Each structure stands twice: as C-alpha cells, then as structure tokens.
Design a protein with these regions (language model features):
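Bacterial Sec-dependent N-terminal signal peptides
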Residues: 1-21
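N-terminal activation segment of mature serine protease catalytic domains
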Residues: 18-53, 59-63, 72, 97
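Short structured motifs
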Residues: 20-21, 83-85, 140-141
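Active-site region of chymotrypsin-like
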Residues: 29-38, 102-109, 134-185
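Solvent-exposed strand-loop boundary residues in beta-sheet-rich modules
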Residues: 40-42, 79-81, 130, 174, ...
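Conserved hydrophobic positions within beta-strands
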Residues: 51-53, 85-88, 142, 170
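Conserved active-site neighborhood of the chymotrypsin/trypsin-like protease fold
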Residues: 55-136, 150-154, 164
C-alpha cells in the first residue's frame, strides 16, 4: 500500500510539470494566441500551427515553416473567429520565424516584448492556444542563453514541449514575451 501511494505521489508531481497554473496575467494574455491554418492553391490544408499578436494593428508572429509553399492562410482566435492573413511582412528561414499582418480581433490581447533579457534559472511560462477558458499552460526555467544579434537572444529551456506548442509564446514573470517555442532539434 505504501508503495502504491509513493508511486501515485511521484506520478502526480511529475504530471504537474506538464500542466500548471499560470500567473493571473495569463488569462488575458492567452487571448493573443491563435491557431494558424495555411492552404495550398487548391484550398486544401497545408499546415496548422500557432501564432500570437504583437500589436493592435494585427501584426503577428509564427513559425516560417507553416507558410512555406502556402497560397493563403487564416488564423482562428481564442474566441473561434476566423480571420485572413493579409500579407507577410518578413521571414527568416534560419530562425524559422515569420512576421505577418492579419485583421485584429477587438476581443484579442496583444503580447508586449520583454524589456530585459531573461537570466539563467529564471521561471518562464508557456501560453498554449486554446478556445477553452480553463486551458492550463506550463512553466519551466531558462537553461542557457545565446546572443544572436543586437539585443536578440536564443533561449534553451528546461521544459517539455510538443508539436502542439510550437510558436506559442514564452513569457517571463511580468507577462512579457521572451520568444516563441520552436521545434525540438
């Protein structure tokens, strides 16, 4: 009996690392995260993924690989509203990032960039895309920081992620964006 309780307790503590309560600011911030659906010229789904708004004019970011070979794309907001992607503003194949313009849903939120770089060991939060109000995110810590340009950083995290979390934002404790999750190499 004691072994069963110990195994259950260990298992429950392991699971809490994957699904945890987020800070209070996260409820509003999750409204900035959306689903991206890209289509080929025959209007068949090419790829699906995530992205998030970075301003109230409809500027957003996601992973570039979603858009490769796409004819057009739409986003689906946390409220389930489908909006067209108007145009690509810039893309970087090396870092797998794309910046694009879409309509802005007035019910959505905007994620502000972090004013300072994160520090090793700092707790960070992953905000998933969800249409559910009670969707849990997860937290982890910064394991390593690499400088990749003027005030640009590449963070290695102590966090388990999946393909469903690619292009979801990573936030600091102040609710500011540090970056977006990329595919594990």
């Amino acid at each position: 009996m004691k072994k069963t309780i110990l195994i259950l307790a260990c298992g429950m503590s392991f699971l809490t690392g994957f699904s945890q309560e987020l800070p209070k600011w996260a409820n509003k911030a999750k409204k900035a995260v959306f689903s991206v659906i890209t289509y080929n010229k025959d209007n068949q789904i090419l790829n699906t993924g995530n992205g998030f708004y970075i301003d109230e004019q409809g500027t957003a970011v996601s992973d570039y690989s979603l858009f490769k070979g796409a004819d057009h794309a739409v986003i689906v907001t946390a409220d389930g509203k489908e909006l067209p992607v108007k145009y690509i503003m810039g893309a970087n194949d090396i870092y797998d990032v794309v910046k694009f313009k879409t309509e802005f849903d007035k019910k959505a939120a905007v994620l502000q960039p972090a004013l300072q770089a994160a520090t090793p060991g700092e707790t960070v939060y992953l905000l998933p895309y969800s249409t559910q109000k009670s969707a849990n995110g997860q937290n982890g810590t910064i394991a390593k920081i690499d400088t990749i340009g003027n005030n640009s950083f590449y963070y290695t995290l102590n966090m388990q992620t999946t393909d469903k979390t690619v292009s979801c934002p990573i936030m600091n404790g102040n609710g500011e964006v540090l970056g977006l999750i990329q595919k594990n190499s």
